[in-house]
């Protein structure tokens, strides 16, 4: 058993079964043994994100952020808050490109990289040391209490927020708890731990079939509510894999969407090696829109990562893909990396981009150009 498994087993022995949300929270965020408390190299061995593919991802995002700044009237300080910033790769790509290609925007830019792990905050600070010294970058454990004007964004963060597991059993919605028996973690079915789960599904008008499983992302709802309150004027941009509720809870997802990732392999062995594998569940974008509206946010639009990146790159024929002095071979390699980001069989159609706003008016964003 892993060290975290020992701790969780002892907790269950003493106090009884725990919700899967509690189990997932400990597996991912325990300050010592949690998966995301480890170095970024452990994470990279299990999966990679769009940031890892090519710097053009950050460069095109920088262009979108710069346009947002323009729409806000070019405020003297534009607070760009990245939630779940990790070791700061994306921050470095956005900052470096803004400094070299978007100088007016860069002068107004205050980039805050929010990350729970102290080791990763230190890595992020080191990676953007020049921008720290120039007063354009800071790493923080918490989201700023106020964001007067700016954008708060995340890339593959919400899929890793803890979820409650549920199952329709004998015509009633039950919760799947985590128990420990016969020296292993097992499912334990019981009544819902909180009425908020019932409200979550009722809000979407979901009708489950017998034995259908689903995840309730209550923490994602709390997250969008809180960041919506802290944002005074600007945008919230969410990039993640998931669906709107009608698709997320249909009969194509009878077993839910929860997966464990280890060594680039996806499995449903959630209880294997607690703290040493990633756990994710698809994002419910309808919930983000619904709870966001309650916090004063308005949906600007939602599109695929493919459409988003292509719309942003169309203006200069994706010239941001290449570095000065690149050889033909290096340029060809960069084009192949771009395909991973935008082609349907790569990341392009699996990932969705949701943009919400508060107090910005109705100006069109380039990344959402062409959507209905």
Regions found by a protein language model. Give the residues of each.
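Rossmann-like AdoMet
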Residues: 1-83, 87-148, 307-310, 316, ...
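A residue-level signal for conserved active-site and pocket-lining positions in enzyme catalytic cores
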Residues: 27, 152, 288
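Conserved protein kinase catalytic core
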Residues: 88, 121, 161-162, 246
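Short amphipathic alpha-helical segments
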Residues: 95, 125-126, 163-167, 249-251
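Short, glycine/acidic-enriched loop or turn micro-motifs at the edges of active sites
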Residues: 118, 158, 243
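Conserved acidic residues
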Residues: 149-150, 234
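A mobile, often basic/glycine-rich helix-loop segment
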Residues: 151-199, 252-261
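Long, Lys/Arg- and hydrophobic-enriched amphipathic alpha-helices
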Residues: 199-372
């Amino acid at each position: 058993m892993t060290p975290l498994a020992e701790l969780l087993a002892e907790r269950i022995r003493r106090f009884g079964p725990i919700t899967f949300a509690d189990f997932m929270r400990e597996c991912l965020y325990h300050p010592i043994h949690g998966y995301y408390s480890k170095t970024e190299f452990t994470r990279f061995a299990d999966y990679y994100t769009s940031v890892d593919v090519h710097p053009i991802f950050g460069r095109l995002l920088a262009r979108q952020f710069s346009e947002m700044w323009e729409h806000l009237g070019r405020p003297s300080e534009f607070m760009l808050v990245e939630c779940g910033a990790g070791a700061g790769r994306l921050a470095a790509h956005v900052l470096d490109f803004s400094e070299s290609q978007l100088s007016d925007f860069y002068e107004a830019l205050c980039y805050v990289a929010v990350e729970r792990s102290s080791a990763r905050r230190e890595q992020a600070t080191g990676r953007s040391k020049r921008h720290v010294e120039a007063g354009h970058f800071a790493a923080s454990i918490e989201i700023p209490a106020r964001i007067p004007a700016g954008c708060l964004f995340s890339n593959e963060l919400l899929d890793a927020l803890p979820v409650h597991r549920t199952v329709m059993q004998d015509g009633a919605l039950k919760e799947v708890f985590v128990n420990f028996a016969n020296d292993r973690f097992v499912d334990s079915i019981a009544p819902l731990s909180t009425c908020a789960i019932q409200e979550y599904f009722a809000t979407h008008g979901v009708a489950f079939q017998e034995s259908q499983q689903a995840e309730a992302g209550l923490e994602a709802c709390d997250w969008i509510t809180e960041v919506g309150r802290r944002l005074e004027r600007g945008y919230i941009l969410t990039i993640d894999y998931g669906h709107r509720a009608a698709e997320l809870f249909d009969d194509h997802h009878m077993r839910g969407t929860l997966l464990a990732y280890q060594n680039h392999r996806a499995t449903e062995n959630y209880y294997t090696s607690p703290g040493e594998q990633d756990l994710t569940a698809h994002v419910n974008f309808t919930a983000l829109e619904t709870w966001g509206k309650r916090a004063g946010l308005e949906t600007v639009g939602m599109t695929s990562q493919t459409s988003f990146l292509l719309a942003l790159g169309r203006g200069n024929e994706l010239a941001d893909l290449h570095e000065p002095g690149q050889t033909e071979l290096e340029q060809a390699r960069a084009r192949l990396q771009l395909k991973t980001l935008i082609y349907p069989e790569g990341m392009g159609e699996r990932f969705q981009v949701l943009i919400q706003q508060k107090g910005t008016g109705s100006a069109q964003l380039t990344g959402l150009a062409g959507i209905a």
